[in-house]
Design a protein with these regions (language model features):
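Helix-rich C-terminal or lid/interface subdomains of diverse kinases
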Residues: 2-54
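Hydrophobic anchor at the beta1->P-loop junction of P-loop NTPases
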Residues: 62-64, 90
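Conserved substrate/cofactor phosphate-moiety recognition/catalytic segment
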Residues: 80-133
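Conserved phosphate-donor/acceptor-positioning beta-strand/loop module used by diverse small-molecule
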Residues: 156-173
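Pre-Walker A (Motif I) flank of P-loop NTPase domains
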Residues: 57-62, 131-133
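P-loop (Walker A) phosphate-binding loop of NTP-binding proteins
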Residues: 67
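Conserved lysine of the Walker
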Residues: 72
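Hydrophobic positions on the alpha1 helix immediately C-terminal to the Walker A/P-loop
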Residues: 75, 79
Length: 173
């Protein structure tokens, strides 16, 4: 994860452009080789992708909630890939502004640092939603106020918000 969420606003445009270029290449190939079924299939796939990506987007928010070790990260990674959502990870964003130095590791878990991390996640979720991309936020969300902030964000945009709660037996945690 590069952390370049601001680039999401242009991503759809460039994916559509690239799909149309690939569709054109496939069309030219089929023109030169009319019996090339693979070229026809490639054209259909790329052009279809471009059409789907120009349709109005329906973003939403999924909050992955639960204790550390309950499976949130594994599930959210798989779900994000499956549904084409942007996944925001509290673990990744928590470590991003600080050196990966043992002396500073405990500073990442103060109440202030945790609140700042949720504020950053919310800002990144706003940026992601501005780009009309669905977003999955992978964090413990143990405090009601942290969940409420994202629920308010979704409500303010009239988009759905879902909370996926993860549980695990104590020996697993």
């Amino acid at each position: 994860c590069t952390g370049d969420y601001a680039g999401l606003a242009a991503l759809r445009l460039y994916v559509v452009y690239r799909a149309l270029v690939r569709a054109l290449v496939a069309a030219l190939k089929q023109r030169d080789h009319p019996r090339d079924d693979a070229a026809a299939a490639a054209f259909d796939a790329y052009f279809g992708l471009a059409v789907r990506l120009t349709a109005p987007a329906s973003p939403f928010v999924i909050l992955c909630h639960g204790f550390s070790g309950s499976g949130k990260s594994v599930a959210s990674k798989a779900l994000a890939q499956r549904i084409g959502a942007v996944r925001l990870s509290s673990d990744i964003e928590r470590k991003r502004p600080m050196r990966d130095d043992g002396a500073f590791a405990s500073a990442r878990y103060t109440d202030e640092a945790i609140d700042n991390n949720y504020a950053r996640l919310r800002m990144l979720a706003e940026t992601t939603l501005d780009a009309l991309c669905p977003v999955i936020v992978d964090a413990t969300f143990l405090k009601r106020a942290h969940r409420a902030s994202f629920i308010e964000l979704a409500a303010g945009r009239s988009i759905p918000v879902y909370i996926a709660t993860f549980n695990a037996d104590l020996p697993v945690l």
